[in-house]
Amino acid sequence: MTDHIGTFIQVTGNDFDRKFAMDNMDIRFADNGALAGKSITYGISLNNNPTVQDPFNTLNGWKFPYMASELAPSPAASPLINGVLGQQVLGATAYAFYDKSLYAEVGGYKTLSRSLRNKINAGEDGSISGVSPYWRLSYFKDMGAQNLRAGFFGMEVKLQPDFLSGPTDQYRDIGVDAAYQFLGSGENIFTVNTSYINERRTLNSSFAGGSASNLHGNLTRFDLAGSYHYLNTYGVTLGLFDTRGNKDDALYNTGDADAGSINSSPNSRGYTVQADWTPWGKKSSWGAPYANARLGLQYTGYTKFNGGKNNYDGLGRDAKDNNTLFAFIWAAF
């Protein structure tokens, strides 16, 4: 847009529900300067999904898998910061990257109105009371042919699940993440990304209304992904994920086919493996760097789903019944 203002706006459509929806959005101001004799890049981001503005590939906004099937069932539970609030909120954050090594960000989020969410086909997971604070701190070390990074992040949310006044469900999400990347000469590229989120819950509204059996609860999420790419053309990635939390009969044993848990448990774990081909990824490609396309085959398997391996919903469905093979073509302009 200008030398200091840029936008990223993503609109997604699929044949499953035959609708287009507002996806990720990031509008930001950025500038460079100096502080105490060191370089600093700073700015402000206006975005609709906590973590979508993050510059690294370990948080939900940009972590592996980068796309997935719209048809496949998903586990019933996930920490709020792990994508639950995406497209339903609008937030502003201020960030700074100091001396090409220390990244810090702080801001807050509010939910969009219910009518606006309906117009842009966003989800309806309740309404945030007040402003939900978000923070991020990360250290980055660039060593030329390789780099590594480690950081912290978190968010606190007071959510009214029924869009009414009164008590709120309170969530405190705190996470750690780390990454390593080997670039070498650009021929063989390896990456490892990992994150862990711990969510503490006090479900004042849900407990009072009978939709939760326990006032207090917890939920954790662990992700680990490793990838190898040859000449930026041929690649393979393996990701592992594990979600665990306390049992809650009213919250998870809904009796729903596919989505319920006869064990009243949110525990789910599995893996995703992907092979992909980027035909114009080489530096010598005729289309580099403007022709961007990727063809891939992705398989997601579950060893546990909503608290069980076999008959997890009480209606005969096993965890492996949610395994999904997904083929895709990804193009960017």
Where are these regions (language model features)?
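Outer membrane beta-barrel
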Residues: 1-114, 129-145, 180-183, 222-245, ...
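Transmembrane beta-strands of outer-membrane beta-barrel proteins
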Residues: 8-10, 43-47, 105-109, 151-155, ...
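Sequence/structural signature of outer-membrane beta-barrel proteins
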Residues: 12-16, 34, 49-53, 111-120, ...
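Transmembrane beta-barrel outer-membrane domains
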Residues: 18-22, 83-87, 126-132, 167-173, ...
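Outer-membrane beta-barrel translocator domains and adjoining extracellular loop/strand segments
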Residues: 20-26, 56-61, 116-124, 160-168, ...
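Membrane-embedded beta-strands of outer-membrane beta-barrel proteins
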Residues: 25-27, 92, 134-137, 150, ...
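Detector for outer-membrane/organellar transmembrane beta-barrel domains
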Residues: 145-281, 286
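Outer-membrane beta-barrel "beta-signal"
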Residues: 273-279, 319-333
